[in-house]
Amino acid sequence: MVVGQAKAAMGKISSAIGERSKRISGAMNEPLRKRKILLVIVCIAMLLDNMLYMVIVPIVPNYLETIRTYKLVYITIPSNGTNGSLLNSTQRAVLERNPNANEDIQIGVLFASKAILQLLSNPFTGTFIDRVGYDIPLLIGLTIMFFSTITFAFGESYAILFAARSLQGLGSAFADTSGIAMIADKYTEESERTQALGIALAFISFGSLVAPPFGGVLYQFAGKWVPFLVLSFVCLLDGILLLMVVTPFASRTRGNTLQGTPIHKLMIDPYIAVVAGALTTCNIPLAFLEPTISNWMKKTMNASEWQMGITWLPAFFPHILGVYITVKLAAKYPNYQWLYGAFGLVIIGVSSCTIPACRNFEELIIPLCALCFGIALVDTALLPTLAFLVDIRYVSVYGSVYAIADISYSVAYALGPIMAGQIVHDLGFVQLNLGMGLVNILYAPALLFLRNVCQMKPSLSERNILLEDGPKGLYDTIIMEERKAAKEPHGTSSGNHSVHAVLSDQEGYSE
């Protein structure tokens, strides 16, 4: 009797759990909700990548100091004779620390190794993403980042830390590119796409700015391995959430996928090249200031350790403000994305030129905030433009075009840690900032080249002119199918079937 009641109760509990699981699964797979969950997953991946990129800033220099190798040196100890003469001597072995003359170079190479490998990997990862979709590369990227973070936590030599840093670059090439491309694919309406990419940029900024104090505090009070284990745990949870939402390894036929445009063809597109150049140019000041501004603050304004530690933290709020303003302007005036980017480049240039004139910490905060505000304008305006260019000129597959965007960022962050210190040593901090500011201001007029492209967004007549050469993007393909259907005797049914076939191809590709 009791056993039967227990079995019945267990059956009811199991049934309730199964029913609840089905409801949760059904809710997560509802299209609009699933799109929002995927945006959260991508934003967490961006946050983790940039936190891992910046969390080592307060940790690595001090840690390398503690593990700096010793070398065995033999010193001669003379012995005096009875009359004061040196009759014999003895040798004693002592441990002597290796000089740290090349420590700055080692740290610079370690910081740059992530961006260098990311730069080298992106041409291949972009093509891979175009072929298999966005979910598998995102999962691969999260997996690589997880193992990279674990390696950072327990690595105890420069070689292991270098390998972990380089491994992170490979993971970023998969996760960053596929994540941004997934957002562009899921959010097809221009204002929604700009808003979603702006949210992702906000997470990138937050990760970069909060990571140094996060890493420094945990490193000081809990040890080197704690901040990396925290990040690896969040990375693991993000990967599990991704597996709950999508089925990356479900069977898919090759015929149901759209073939993306080769990356080399996108690279020589003049419009995409202008956007990529702007993304590189606007990030050069940030990439070159991060490794040099602390020493300059110490020498120029006798800044304290806490001031150098929170140098970039106030800039987070203007960056968010820049994202918000650009999203609102793009929704109301979508034809002027190029103008928002050009204005951002000018702000970056002026801010970079005024940084050397600052003589205290309070003054320095103003140009740094303006610098990050300008970067937000450029990134938020131009990243959606890349997806739009692919939509109207090629096939609506975004892996390769956002691999080009990732390459643009990686160029700046690969050169910064290696070249910035040498430029300051040879030319000076003032000359470095004036040069970076001048480059940004001079590049701003190049975005005029995008003016006509942006004006095509609401112009159906110009899109129809493009369609005379045949369909290129997904939406143009649908329009062409509808035109053909209208000319056929039984156009309605065949036209609907063709349009549904195109849409199902895209859904089969991105799911």
Curated annotation (Swiss-Prot):
TM spans (from-to): 37-57, 109-129, 136-156, 166-186, 198-218, 226-246, 268-288, 307-327, 338-358, 364-384, 401-421, 429-449
Domain of life: Eukaryota
Subcellular location per the Swiss-Prot or TrEMBL entry: Membrane
SUPFAM superfamilies cross-referenced by the UniProt entry: MFS general substrate transporter
Region (Disordered): 486-511
Membrane topology, Cytoplasmic segments: 1-36, 130-135, 187-197, 247-267, 328-337, 385-400, 450-511
Described purpose of this protein according to its UniProt entry: Involved in acetylcholine transport into synaptic vesicles.
Name of this protein: Vesicular acetylcholine transporter
Species annotation: Torpedo torpedo (Common torpedo)
